[in-house]
């Protein structure tokens, strides 16, 4: 098996309104994904009218940022329990998770649900304590509550030893201590690259990919979002699509 050291696949999971989509916006801006004069709306990945109206993510969305020679594929998952299937779908695409928790509210019911799913898949986790700028922030207590949640979910010793990053996603700042944030998200990017492993695959194996979402474009027709597990996908190559129940 070979590893793609130039890639990272990560999902951002959290309870609703803990700042996932705001953090993705900041990561996109700071990675140079937009031109300085480009007019970009807030909540870039929220494309549905209901998502923008309610300020929530309903469907798992994907985007990517480039940091030096590394491409970071990011999946923004829903933060509401009613869309748990989308969370599970997103976790099949990644090799690690950014668990975002509000520095005041701490872990809430959906935090427990998404964390359980990530632990079941044995995905490495980076804890991001967001909104540390809030007047009622209680970062140290929240970290302890997250540790207790890991123990309550029967996480083993290796899973409990997770790195912690503190952030103010709206301001685009992060750091390794709640009272010492860098002027940008560099500490978060560095921790992500160090803690999330690169994907492994066998390029000599026949093509094997998992389709996680379908879409349509007026210009390109039907689109399939997939993760390549093994092999190589080449333009013009004939591909057989199979349902999971087909042997």
Residue ranges and their predicted role:
Residues 1-247:
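Structural and coupling elements of P-loop NTPases
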């Amino acid at each position: 098996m070979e590893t793609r050291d130039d890639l990272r696949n990560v999902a951002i999971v959290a309870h609703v309104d803990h700042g996932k989509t705001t953090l993705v916006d900041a990561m996109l801006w700071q990675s140079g994904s937009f031109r300085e004069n480009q007019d970009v709306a807030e909540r870039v990945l929220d494309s549905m009218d209901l998502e923008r109206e309610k300020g929530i993510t309903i469907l798992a969305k994907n985007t990517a940022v480039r940091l030096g020679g590394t491409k970071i594929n990011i999946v923004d998952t829903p933060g509401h329990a009613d869309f748990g299937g989308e969370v599970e779908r997103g976790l099949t695409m990644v090799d690690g998770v950014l668990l975002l928790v509000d520095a005041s509210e701490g872990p809430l019911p959906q935090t427990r649900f998404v964390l359980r799913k990530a632990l079941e898949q044995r995905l490495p986790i980076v804890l991001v304590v967001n909104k540390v700028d809030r007047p009622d922030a209680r970062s140290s207590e929240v970290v302890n509550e997250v540790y207790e949640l890991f123990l309550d979910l029967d996480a083993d010793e290796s899973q409990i030893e997770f790195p912690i990053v503190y952030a103010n996603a709206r301001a685009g700042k992060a750091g390794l201590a709640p009272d010492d944030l860098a002027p940008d998200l560099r500490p978060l990017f560095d921790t992500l690259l160090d803690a999330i492993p690169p994907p492994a695959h066998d390029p000599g194996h026949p093509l094997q990919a998992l389709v996680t979402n379908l879409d349509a474009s007026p210009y390109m027709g039907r689109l399939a979002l997939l993760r390549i597990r093994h092999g190589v996908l080449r333009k013009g190559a004939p591909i057989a699509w199979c349902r999971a129940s087909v042997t």
